[in-house]
Amino acid sequence: MTWRDEIARRVRGEHLRDAPLAPRTAVRVGGPADLLCRPADGDALSALLRAVRELGVPLSVLGGGANTLVADAGVRGVVLRLPQEFPGESTDGDTLVLSAGAPISRLPARAHAHGLVGMEFLGGIPGTLGGAAAMNAGTRLGEMKDVVTRLELATPDGTGFVPASALGYAYRTCRLPPGAVIARVEVRLHPGDVAASEALMREDRERRRATQPLYRPTFGSTFTNPPGEYAGRLVEAVGLKGHRVGNAIWSPVHANFVTNLGGATARDVLALVRLARARVQERFGIALETEVRLLGEFLEEDLEGLDGHAAAGGGPGAASGGVRPPEAT
């Protein structure tokens, strides 16, 4: 029995072998996963975490595919993708608990249905709630740390809620315990003017459509903004707006967005990222930090010149191991 057979035997849920990942990412780039798993519930999720630990198989987490670049060679081991409908969602007064695999849009929809506001910054942000919570997603209107009260974390030993105050929330990041996966997200909002909230979110979506290249595949912002600066302005200032490598391009619309013109490779994308980092460092003395998570087997030369955040390959509640799995048959 192969490790893929063993995981399918132990873990209730959906198991897809050699699953294409490019269609499951926003930028539409990358190779397949040895095994893509969608556990049926929290117990199945913990069973999966136990299985990969005991079998020595790497585990990575894929949310909605935003802010993620998958290697052209794909991802060895197991890629976990939580189903959108995960048991245990609830609403109690001003507190909502939602599945980490749910689309971000579910939170404002559920909140508005109960007369709650306070999450207007989520208007137009793609991805899943788990990914948003792990990366502290946000805009000028606010960020996830403003509303998250607790995260339910799954480990090989079970699941439990951890207060947000213990997770070291900071700009576009938080500190999850090693090996933990976000299963559910608890947020606290407040009663308010739902119509005004909807109008503000609609305005933010329209602003994004007018200023960002959302008509092409893109993983979103490539770099975080340095203090007092805008990454897009820096990339444009060094002459890279509209610069193309292969079928990937620094967008002529917004210079902090790499877009896929059709058939782009991860290598094309990383060439653009490395070039921008080098030029901005040389001209301005600023080391741009990527907001993009790398997933899979990249060539060392493709990772050269990237910051540690990207090269580490961590992710939204991901337990990412360096152990090469047995032959995936």
Swiss-Prot record:
Disulfide bonds: none
GO cellular component, one term: cytosol
Entry GO MF terms: FAD binding; UDP-N-acetylmuramate dehydrogenase activity
Pathway named in the protein's UniProt entry: Cell wall biogenesis; peptidoglycan biosynthesis
Chloroplast among keywords: no
Matches recorded under Pfam families: FAD_binding_4, MurB_C
PROSITE patterns: FAD_PCMH (PS51387)
Biased composition (Gly residues): 311-320
Positions of region (Disordered): 307-329
Top-level class of the enzyme under EC nomenclature: oxidoreductase
Catalytic activity: UDP-N-acetyl-alpha-D-muramate + NADP(+) = UDP-N-acetyl-3-O-(1-carboxyvinyl)-alpha-D-glucosamine + NADPH + H(+)
Active site: 172, 221, 291
InterPro entries: FAD-bd_PCMH (IPR016166), FAD-bd_PCMH-like_sf (IPR036318), FAD-bd_PCMH_sub1 (IPR016167), FAD-bd_PCMH_sub2 (IPR016169), MurB (IPR003170), MurB_C (IPR011601), MurB_C_sf (IPR036635), Oxid_FAD_bind_N (IPR006094)
Requisite cofactors: FAD
Keywords (A to Z) from UniProt: Cell cycle, Cell division, Cell shape, Cell wall biogenesis/degradation, Cytoplasm, FAD, Flavoprotein, NADP, Oxidoreductase, Peptidoglycan synthesis
GO process terms (BP): cell division; cell wall organization; peptidoglycan biosynthetic process; regulation of cell shape
Main location: cytoplasm
Family designation: Belongs to the MurB family.
Function statement: Cell wall formation.
Entry protein name: UDP-N-acetylenolpyruvoylglucosamine reductase
Source species: Anaeromyxobacter dehalogenans (strain 2CP-1 / ATCC BAA-258)
Gene assigned in the entry: murB
